[in-house]
């Protein structure tokens, strides 16, 4: 058996990300899922790029604020306390719009953990 308590404030925020990002996967010693905590100020996007995953399912639980998720068909508005799920091979770009009144904080879970599974998506290529 194994148990851990992780304080996200103890997890280092790496440079080079479009918003505040804390990977909880390693700190929680997780093997079967990836877990990340994000905080995006107005005008910041959550992922490094508009993308999809070939095998990984993703789930975003909004802890505070409102998350906007752009997809090829529409932009979803996900309020605080709600969950947004993404199937494999489904392009998305989670962000906090420039005209937002507040930051958005979310917990992102992906399974299976697949650090090299993300594929950049260009919405202009669908035309």
Indicate residue ranges for each PLM-predicted region:
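Short acidic-glycine-tyrosine-enriched beta hairpin
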Residues: 72-89
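Short, charged/polar surface micro-motifs in flexible loops or helix N-caps
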Residues: 30-31, 41-46, 66, 112-114
């Amino acid at each position: 058996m194994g148990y851990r308590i992780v304080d996200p404030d103890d997890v280092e925020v790496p440079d080079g990300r479009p918003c505040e990002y804390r990977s909880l996967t390693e700190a929680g010693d997780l093997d079967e899922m990836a877990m990340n905590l994000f905080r995006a100020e107005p005008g910041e996007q959550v992922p490094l790029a508009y993308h999809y995953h070939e095998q990984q399912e993703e789930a975003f639980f909004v802890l505070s604020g409102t998350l906007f998720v752009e997809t090829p068909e529409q932009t979803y508005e996900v309020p605080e306390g709600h969950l947004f799920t993404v199937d494999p091979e489904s392009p998305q770009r989670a962000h906090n719009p420039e005209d937002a009144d507040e930051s958005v904080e979310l917990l992102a879970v992906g399974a299976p953990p697949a650090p090299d599974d993300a594929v950049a998506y260009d919405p202009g290529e669908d035309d």
